[in-house]
Regions:
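P-loop NTPase motor domains
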Residues: 1-117, 178
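Conserved ATP-driven motor cores of ASCE-family P-loop NTPases powering translocation/secretion/packaging/pilus
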Residues: 93, 97-102, 106-185
Length: 185
């Protein structure tokens, strides 16, 4: 008897994802989402920002796929997971649950090497790591490599203790210039 109200609530919450629901065409039928043969995966979620219900579900699907591939598959080849413009997804918007994404990034940075994998994020500024809360600290402590391009906020990143550069190294970093349309320094 106690399961009936729970089942009704579950059915109500899933109605938009059923065959006739607003998002049904994304989830009904054979799945075409397969990253098992991909060595390089970019999580590009920009189009979903305006649809928080769909955003949360797709993030769960992607996290599940990445987890399966990275942690549970054979370790015979390396894997690389890159989250582009990651900071925009760490800024909560109406209805978005970012805890799963933050946890996946955090666990990825902590555990991926053990499974011949690596995790990366692309940010506009090192200071964007402050948006990540505790996950930002995990990223700082576990990122083996950083690619730092031209930026105007490196002094602020030093003040925020995100970067520990000073003197010549900081001056050298601040001297990096973009040389469009060619490759940069």
């Amino acid at each position: 008897d106690h399961l009936v109200p729970t089942a009704r609530e579950l059915a109500f919450n899933l109605r938009d994802f059923g065959s006739d629901g607003a998002y049904g065409h994304y989830f009904n039928g054979p799945s075409t989402f397969d990253i098992s043969n991909d060595e390089f995966v970019v999580l590009e979620l920009e189009r979903l920002k305006a649809m928080p219900d769909l955003f949360n579900v797709v993030v769960m699907v992607v996290i599940n796929a990445v987890t399966q591939e990275l942690y549970l598959s054979a370790r015979d080849r390396p894997r690389f997971v890159l989250c582009d413009e990651a900071a925009q997804f760490m800024t909560r918007e109406e209805g978005q649950d970012l805890s799963r994404l933050a946890e996946a990034i955090s666990q990825g940075y902590r555990r991926a090497r053990k499974y011949r994998g690596s995790f990366g994020i692309i940010l506009q500024s090192m200071n964007d790591l402050l948006l990540f809360g505790g996950t930002g600290q995990v990223i700082l402590e576990n990122a083996a490599t950083r690619f730092l391009l031209q930026g105007s906020t490196y002094d602020k990143a030093v003040e925020n203790k995100i970067l520990d550069y000073s003197g010549f190294v900081l001056d050298l970093l601040k001297s990096v210039r973009n040389n469009k349309p060619n490759y940069s320094e």
